[in-house]
Amino acid sequence: MRIILLGAPGAGKGTQAQFIMQQYGIPQISTGDMLRAAVKAGTPLGLEAKKVMDAGQLVSDELIIGLVKERIAQDDCVKGFLLDGFPRTIPQADAMAANGIEIDHVIEIDVPDEEIVKRMSGRRVHSGSGRVYHVVFNPPKVEGKDDVTGEDLSIRPDDEESTVRKRLDIYHEQTKPLVEYYGNVAAQGKTQYNKFDGTQSVAAVSEQLAKVIG
């Protein structure tokens, strides 16, 4: 079961990724975690990546693909894997195909931009404990105050509306073209592509996912 999960930041990919991992017993592979693990393990590719990152440069697609191949050859990927946050661009998707990395399911969690802005910019955090609230979906008892300590809540820089909109712009520019790309791959019978309405409840999306993946 080799799965790619697509969707904008805040679409609920993380929640569904947890469900897929538990349901099917496959690991979630994020490029960030993979890079850190390879660097820590001191593999040849990990050392090469460390050199690039220490110089403040971006790790090349070629190197990332090498790390992906190395990672999916490990024992815990025997049943499959879930790729999260990769590929992000069409050249990366092409490179995966060229390296013989086949994908069974491409899953897109689709949520309109305005809904994502509402979800993310409404988050409030108590920095001392990490407790998270939401002004609409999970408000504190007293506006702007932590329920337990009564201390002020804050907005994380990542959740500022302007930051959320910038991240959405990058997603539409870089990653949205992958939707069309994998739609074409699916039309050729080389993978299955399914889009889910991420504005539904978490349970409803999980149930639909399970039906499609089988």
UniProtKB/Swiss-Prot annotation:
Pathway: Purine metabolism; AMP biosynthesis via salvage pathway; AMP from ADP: step 1/1
Principal EC category: transferase
Alphabetical list of Gene3D superfamilies matching this protein: P-loop containing nucleotide triphosphate hydrolases (3.40.50.300)
Residues covered by region (NMP): 30-59
UniProt: ATP binding residues: G10, A11, G12, K13, G14, T15, R123, V132, Y133, Q200
Molecular function, one GO term: adenylate kinase activity
Binding site for AMP: T31, R36, Q57, L58, V59, G85, F86, P87, R88, Q92, R156, R167
Keywords: ATP-binding, Cytoplasm, Kinase, Nucleotide biosynthesis, Nucleotide-binding, Transferase
Entry GO CC: cytoplasm
Coarse class of the protein's main subcellular location: cytoplasm
Keyword ATP-binding among record annotations: yes
Family statement: Belongs to the adenylate kinase family.
The protein's name: Adenylate kinase
Taxonomic source organism: Shewanella denitrificans (strain OS217 / ATCC BAA-1090 / DSM 15013)
UniProt gene name: adk
